[in-house]
């Protein structure tokens, strides 16, 4: 069982780049690991943007900039396109992000994030631009993500937007359940349904 998701208020890490694909999130050479080793994948999130070929740090990349921190990643439009590798969601979760905000997500990556207890919050392009502007002007800008109410709020401007989420996934996040946990939790109901179903 994972940590339950309710309301998160945090400063943000801005990544105002569109069309970030899964190979940029976690390069293919790290896909040999087939178990979810969160620290390994988190350490290599955006590896080729964070480090030069010789392993030295790219000082001006946002994850290396101490100005920005928090458990919310604010990303440009069309986040998570490309191959369907679940490792990309592992890397995001492993780094410590609990929320990713963008104006559009690739469907498969969006589902992979949900399956790994990262909440993808899709907002309008206008709201996303406002977030980037607020964070740029004040890196201590906080954003509140309220899963029960399905709202995201820029605490600096007070502006909020509603976001959509599958009802089942919302239930799982709020109760810290993955698919197996959910089935185990509802095992008795499943058995009752099976016993009550006639076979023709």
Q: Regions from the language model: what does each represent?
A:
Residues 1-200:
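Cytosolic catalytic domains that perform sulfur/thiol-centered chemistry
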């Amino acid at each position: 069982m994972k940590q339950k998701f309710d309301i998160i208020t945090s400063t943000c890490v801005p990544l105002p780049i569109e069309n970030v694909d899964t190979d940029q999130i976690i390069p293919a050479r790290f896909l040999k690991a087939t178990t979810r080793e969160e620290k390994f994948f988190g350490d290599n999130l955006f590896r080729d943007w964070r480090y030069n070929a010789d392993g030295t740090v790219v000082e001006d990349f946002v994850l290396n900039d101490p100005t920005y921190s928090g458990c919310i990643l604010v990303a440009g439009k069309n986040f998570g396109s490309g191959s369907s590798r679940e490792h990309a969601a592992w890397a995001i979760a492993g780094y410590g992000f609990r929320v990713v905000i963008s104006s559009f997500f690739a469907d498969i990556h969006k589902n992979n994030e949900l399956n790994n207890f990262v909440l993808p919050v899709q907002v309008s392009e206008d709201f996303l631009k406002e977030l980037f502007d607020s964070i740029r002007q004040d890196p201590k800008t906080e954003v509140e993500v309220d899963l029960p109410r399905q709202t995201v709020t820029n605490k600096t401007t007070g502006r909020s937007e509603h976001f959509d989420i599958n009802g089942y996934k919302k239930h799982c996040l709020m109760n810290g359940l993955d698919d197996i946990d959910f089935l185990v939790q509802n095992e008795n109901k499943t058995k009752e349904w099976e016993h009550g179903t006639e076979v023709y």
